[in-house]
Design a protein with these regions (language model features):
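Eukaryotic scaffold/interaction segments
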Residues: 1-125
Length: 125
């Protein structure tokens, strides 16, 4: 039985929803995502990152995450919560971090978050 191909829009929709929940947790002390939501999102990341080329979405997810984080840093001037958000995002994108990022020697997910907030803070200064 062939595995279903997961498209970028479906993948990013699940990731973005979970990242928004993490944003509320980190910056507004919101409710944590349910285990079902979190496990579904991590499973989608895993499947999307292990699909055979040209359907492998690792590069697209990394790029979109970087863009999402830059936008988040511009919206959230408050530095409180950055480390919590970075930990949550790293956990969600663990598979991407462990294989794609390491193989291409890219900045790790936590470093992407910190760099985005540092750049936003420098732009405001």
């Amino acid at each position: 039985m062939a595995r279903r191909i997961i498209e970028l829009d479906e993948t990013w929709s699940a990731i973005e929803y979970t990242l928004r929940v993490f944003e509320e947790v980190a910056f507004e002390d919101g409710a944590r995502p349910t285990a079902e939501v979190f496990s579904k999102a991590t499973a989608i990341v895993y499947v999307a990152c292990t699909q055979k080329p040209p359907n492998n979405l690792s590069a697209d997810i990394y790029y979109r995450f970087s863009q999402h984080t830059n936008e988040l840093a511009k919206r959230r001037k408050n530095q409180y919560g950055i480390s919590r958000y970075a930990r949550c995002a790293t956990t969600l994108l663990n598979y991407l971090n462990r294989f794609y990022v390491k193989r291409l020697k890219l900045p790790e997910i936590e470093n992407v978050v910190n760099a985005a907030f540092d750049a936003a803070a420098a732009a405001d200064a």
